[in-house]
Amino acid sequence: MAGVWAPEHSVEAHSNQSSAADGCGSVSVAFPITMMVTGFVGNALAMLLVVRSYRRRESKRKKSFLLCIGWLALTDLVGQLLTSPVVILVYLSQRRWEQLDPSGRLCTFFGLTMTVFGLSSLLVASAMAVERALAIRAPHWYASHMKTRATPVLLGVWLSVLAFALLPVLGVGRYSVQWPGTWCFISTGPAGNETDSAREPGSVAFASAFACLGLLALVVTFACNLATIKALVSRCRAKAAASQSSAQWGRITTETAIQLMGIMCVLSVCWSPLLIMMLKMIFNQMSVEQCKTQMGKEKECNSFLIAVRLASLNQILDPWVYLLLRKILLRKFCQIRDHTNYASSSTSLPCPGSSVLMWSDQLER
């Protein structure tokens, strides 16, 4: 979804003429290129780190957790590589999308790709939050009942989302060129030359289902992460009362709580505006396709474009909030602690080193 990062003025919003895009030179095309490169680097680093950690792990549960993170990074990476080059091509050609894709097949592929990789990322993040909450709040039940391997679950989620995204190909829903004319996504209402009564019920149902599924995934993720934080705090207090490495438990709890809150903040900032705005536009019987033919839609169109840009940021931030940033912070913590210990010649708790799953090792005890 990184490809939608481009200036609003790159295509004339209120004209049906087949004119070249305004400002589609090297400056405007730098946006999607920068987003694609940034996302590629972050997700590629995350995947390399997951592969290295996966080979050193013996516990199936730890391997499942790493597999989920790796799958999330792979999903974000492939989604960017499939969409960004298309948008870059549109900008470099300085032609309207309809001229480059008169059959509409590329638009359908682009919209399907954004739907599959956007929604699957949300659902995988939600599944990870559920598993994390069960493992921490009910460890004995989790150990005895959760025998399902991660790979079938991840494949099931991806195939289910793919089947859902294929509905417009079967006639339920519609993918259309979105303002300013450099990308395609789910249509939320009538096209620019249609009236309100011309809306297809299938398009409304499909767009509503996407928004509701996304919001449901966000709610589940939030609820599970909050439940996990609460359980961690309660266990930390119990350990402190029993004087069982209270300092270490306090540090682990703080680090994990900060990471989970960071995940919630990133998801809410990146996805909530788009999903809520889609429902609002469906309710108001509006589509950003109308921006090309109707005056007075500038505010709504700009807001929707900003919301999509925020959603595209999620693919770049995912590897950092789930893996890379935590690893960097842990390594920095070890460096500071080792320096302090050397200066004071005092003993301390063992350093987690490069282990990304240090906190999960401790929580299982």
From Swiss-Prot:
It is found in: Cell membrane. GO terms for biological process: adenylate cyclase-activating G protein-coupled receptor signaling pathway; adenylate cyclase-modulating G protein-coupled receptor signaling pathway; bicarbonate transport; cAMP biosynthetic process; cAMP/PKA signal transduction; cellular response to forskolin; cellular response to interleukin-1; cellular response to lipopolysaccharide. Principally expressed in the tubules of the renal medulla. Specific expression is seen in medullary and cortical thick ascending limbs; lower levels are detected in cortical and inner medullary collecting ducts. Not detected significantly in the glomeruli. In the brain, expressed in all types of glial cells. Residues 56-68, 131-151, 230-259, 326-365 are cytoplasmic. Keywords: Cell membrane, Disulfide bond, G-protein coupled receptor, Glycoprotein, Lipoprotein, Membrane, Palmitate, Receptor, Transducer, Transmembrane, Transmembrane helix. One of its GO terms (cellular component) is proximal neuron projection. GO terms for molecular function: prostaglandin E receptor activity. Its main location: membrane. Disulfide bonds join 107-184. Residues 1-30, 90-108, 174-203, 284-303 are extracellular. Glycans are attached at residues 16, 193. It is a multi-pass membrane protein. InterPro entries: EP3_rcpt_3, GPCR_Rhodpsn, GPCR_Rhodpsn_7TM, Prostanoid_rcpt, Prostglndn_DP_rcpt, Prostglndn_EP3_rcpt. It comes from the Eukaryota. The chain crosses the membrane at residues 31-55, 69-89, 109-130, 152-173, 204-229, 260-283, 304-325. Receptor for prostaglandin E2 (PGE2). Required for normal development of fever in response to pyrinogens, including IL1B, prostaglandin E2 and bacterial lipopolysaccharide (LPS). Required for normal potentiation of platelet aggregation by prostaglandin E2, and thus plays a role in the regulation of blood coagulation. Required for increased HCO3(-) secretion in the duodenum in response to mucosal acidification, and thereby contributes to the protection of the mucosa against acid-induced ulceration. Not required for normal kidney function, normal urine volume and osmolality. Belongs to the G-protein coupled receptor 1 family. This is Prostaglandin E2 receptor EP3 subtype. The lineage of its organism: Eukaryota, Metazoa, Chordata, Craniata, Vertebrata.
